[in-house]
Amino acid sequence: MPITSQPVYGYLKGPDGHFIVDPEAATVVKQIYSLCLAGNGPTKIARMLTEQNIPTPGTMEYRRTGSTRRYYPDYPCKWSSNTVAHILERREYLGHTVNFKTEKVSYKVKTSVANPENKVMVFEHTHEAIIDEATWERVQELRKQRKRPNRYGEVGLFSGLLFCADCGSVMYQQRYETDKRRQDCYICGSYKKR
């Protein structure tokens, strides 16, 4: 039996330990995938969910268990683009259990690091799928294509991968040039719009 202990957003743990679909959250997951297929990116989807006052995954977990590290009482319905992006990447929505995505560097250090794909184990069809295979694959293709060139005609090394730690918005490449040197940096997309 797969050993993942915590269900992802969209699922609950059943009495036998298997994941069962959470109808309320599964509806939101399907909506996120539909919005992505319609051409919306994580930032726009997050904004739409926030405007609809849909509780975030952290808020839902807090309401069920009374504890979570991802619950912000002042913003119970404020979705981040980072949360949406993670939902769009999760293979668990295909009905698969994914184990060993991260590992601890040392027993002395609490932080985890992402494992390479060859160390990740996927157990297929362990629970009911929320998203069908064709939809999931199409979303992955669309997400890869969204990494578009910047105004200098280059696709940044971190394009589509960096998100603001404060608000969850996408980070954009900014270039500063002087006669002597060129400096690239990344700034928050929300900050740029102010």
Regions found by a protein language model. Name each.
Residues 1-194:
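Conserved catalytic breakage-reunion loop centered on the nucleophilic residue
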